[in-house]
């Protein structure tokens, strides 16, 4: 069976004055949720990252009002993807207005109510519409989805989670992986915990989650000993016309999807960790 869509667990960000959610991630303990907001219908501060406190870890229905937020429009007016360093002291926001990844330093881990400052800006020159972003576990590889060209670009970081790109901290583009065989409009990206599975959301003509297995963890070079294999896709179109991003809880038994036009964060229960099946969703 495929994932079970749990309608009762849908989180309506529209009721929190958020109109176009782009991406969602959690703190490592699951008690904070961060939503990239590209447009706010009643004010001009819509290009921001919103922080919610969850009273129960990874339970999005336990979120209260917006606890804190960071306006990022001064760096990029079209924020799309978000990721944090493992420690939570660095936040990375990718935007397709400036085609860049902006790195912010947080005074307190996973807390936007603390002092948050822009640390580095890294320009993405491989695709004109960068969207989703992810890292391997130690931050020495960064993955950026190219919506325009249908690809995932991999970058090597000399220092983990450091985009300063100077002497000793070089950031290099090392390969490109095409998703066009599965989706021509990739947007969000996520990995399982050990990097042997990759999930890419397709948007528009193919509203689905595509699953790949990686022979070598977090390695998309797709050569001998590093094969990347497409194993199937899961249809999201019944729940969202524009799914943009996805993430999982800590053990991969719940999948969360950002439904942009519906202004929702959707929740799916999985029968086994990171097992999205390849059938239509079960409704509950």
Q: PLM ranges: what are they?
A:
Residues 39-44, 98-100, 148-151, 204-207, ...:
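Short glycine/acidic-enriched loop and turn motifs that connect beta-strands
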Residues 28-29, 86-87, 137-138, 193-194, ...:
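Residue-level detector of Asp-centered blade-edge/turn motifs that repeat once per structural unit
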Residues 6-15, 64-73, 118-124, 170-179, ...:
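A short beta-strand motif characteristic of beta-propeller blades
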Residues 20, 78, 129, 185, ...:
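Beta-rich catalytic cores
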Residues 1-2, 51-61, 104-113, 156-165, ...:
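Short loop/turn segments immediately following beta-strands, especially the blade-tip
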């Amino acid at each position: 069976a495929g994932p079970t869509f749990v309608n009762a667990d849908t989180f309506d960000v529209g009721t929190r004055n958020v109109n176009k959610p782009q991406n969602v991630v959690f703190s490592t303990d699951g008690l904070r949720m961060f939503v990239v907001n590209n447009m706010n219908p009643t004010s001009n501060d819509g290009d921001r990252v919103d922080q919610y406190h969850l009273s129960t870890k990874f339970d999005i229905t336990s979120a209260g009002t917006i606890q804190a937020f960071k306006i990022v429009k001064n760096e990029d007016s079209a924020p799309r993807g978000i990721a944090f360093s493992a420690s939570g002291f660095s936040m990375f926001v990718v935007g397709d207005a400036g085609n860049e990844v902006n790195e912010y330093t947080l005074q307190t881990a996973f807390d936007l109510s603390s002092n948050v400052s822009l640390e580095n800006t890294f320009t993405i020159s491989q695709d004109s519409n960068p969207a989703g972003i992810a890292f391997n576990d130690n931050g020495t590889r960064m993955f950026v989805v190219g919506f325009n060209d249908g690809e995932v670009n991999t970058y090597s970081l000399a220092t983990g989670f450091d985009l300063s790109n100077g002497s000793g901290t070089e950031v290099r583009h090392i390969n490109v992986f095409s998703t066009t065989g599965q989706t021509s409009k990739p947007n969000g990206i996520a990995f399982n915990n050990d990097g042997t599975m990759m999930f890419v959301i397709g948007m528009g003509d193919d509203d689905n989650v595509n699953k790949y297995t990686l022979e070598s963890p977090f390695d998309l070079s797709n050569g001998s000993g590093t094969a990347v294999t497409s194993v199937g896709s899961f249809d999201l179109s019944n729940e969202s016309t524009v799914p943009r991003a996805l993430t999982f809880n800590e053990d991969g038994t719940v999948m969360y999807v950002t439904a942009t036009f519906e202004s929702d964060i959707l929740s799916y229960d999985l029968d086994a960790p990171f097992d999205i099946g390849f059938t239509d969703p079960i409704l509950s």
